[in-house]
């Protein structure tokens, strides 16, 4: 830091930038966002366009007393005007998150495409996601596949799981479960929790892979440890059914409980199945119906069939 300060004192643009960068993103004990702004603005004034996105980031993400979305947009726009890749990403985030502007995924996609066209893997992945889910733009699995493949080719780990899902479901391409599982395995190697979850499900159900309950259980646990909440539902399913493990409804409930608290419809669906079929608990069709109804209220449409089935019992 002191060496860069000496360079800044000699009016070195790199000195100003590096001091600003360290004050913003350096070791915690020297971080000082206000000082970072001063040095980064000086670097930007001297024509160092790379500083523009960092200034925008400080105004966009804080600390709270410095958040100013209008200023963030102003500096990002300066960067966009000179095709600075990180400023383009910052502008995309403003629109995708609705920070200081009306939330607009179409505008977000516009800036993501600009960044993707410049070879940015993060933008390729997020543009692929938008096209896959059709969030604010027309759903287009083929374009999703194209952008996710580009992100994967650029070694972006998160692309593995969604690209694999497209091949597994045959969306935008012919179904190819073998390739899907290879992508999940690669994602697992790269630490992608979603890939771990999908791979575990396929080991559990024997989908393109030999059934392997122990491997499935291990992968579900790894995914959960990395913050993948839906994997809890499938691990609980294994334990409620006693698949490759001792049936233990109390343990299974403790695993699935956070998903129930967070309103996952599929979690309520599983609990309905537990009471309908007496999986380690006494059968209770009334309780099952209440749980299926909750799942349906949370948007899990498959619960309707279960409700219709139970109508003849209660």
Please identify what each model-predicted range represents.
Residues 1-3, 30-39, 65-75, 102-111, ...:
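Structural signature of tandem alpha-helical TPR/SEL1-like repeats
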Residues 6-7, 42-43, 78-79, 114-115, ...:
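Canonical positions in the second alpha-helix
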Residues 9-13, 25-27, 45-49, 61-63, ...:
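Short helix-capping/linker turns of helical repeat alpha-solenoids
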Residues 18-25, 53-61, 90-97, 101, ...:
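Hydrophobic face of amphipathic alpha-helices that form TPR/SEL1-like repeat modules
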Residues 221, 261-263, 271:
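Alpha-helical protein-protein interaction modules
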Residues 296-314:
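Terminal, low-structured helical/coil segments at or just beyond the last alpha-helical repeat
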């Amino acid at each position: 830091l002191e060496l860069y300060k000496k360079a800044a004192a000699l009016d070195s643009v790199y000195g100003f930038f590096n001091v600003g960068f360290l004050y913003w993103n350096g070791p915690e004990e020297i971080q000082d966002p206000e000082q970072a702004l001063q040095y980064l603005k000086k670097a930007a004034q001297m024509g160092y366009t790379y500083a523009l996105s960092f200034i925008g980031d400080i105004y966009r993400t804080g600390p709270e007393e410095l958040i100013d979305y209008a200023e963030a947009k102003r500096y990002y726009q300066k960067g966009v005007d000179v095709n600075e890749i990180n400023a383009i990403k910052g502008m995309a985030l403003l629109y995708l998150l609705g920070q200081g502007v009306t939330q607009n995924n179409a505008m977000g996609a516009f800036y993501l495409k600009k960044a993707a066209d410049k070879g940015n893997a993060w933008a390729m992945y997020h543009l692929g996601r938008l096209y896959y889910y059709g969030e604010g733009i027309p759903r287009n699995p083929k374009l999703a596949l194209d952008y996710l493949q580009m992100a994967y080719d650029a070694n972006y780990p998160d692309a593995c799981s969604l690209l694999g899902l497209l091949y597994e479901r045959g969306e935008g391409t012919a179904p190819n479960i073998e390739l899907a599982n290879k992508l999940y395995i690669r994602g697992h190697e790269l630490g992608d929790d979603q890939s771990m979850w999908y791979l575990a499900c396929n080991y559990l159900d024997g989908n393109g892979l030999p059934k392997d309950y122990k491997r499935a259980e291990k992968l579900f646990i790894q995914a959960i440890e990395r913050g993948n909440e839906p994997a809890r539902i499938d691990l609980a399913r294994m334990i409620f059914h006693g698949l490759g493990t001792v049936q233990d409804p109390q343990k299974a409930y403790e695993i699935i409980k956070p998903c129930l608290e967070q309103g996952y419809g599929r979690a309520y669906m599983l609990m309905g199945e537990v009471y309908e079929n007496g999986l380690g608990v006494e059968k209770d069709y009334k309780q099952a119906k209440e749980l299926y109804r909750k799942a349906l209220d949370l948007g899990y449409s498959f619960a309707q069939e279960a409700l219709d089935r139970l109508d003849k019992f209660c």
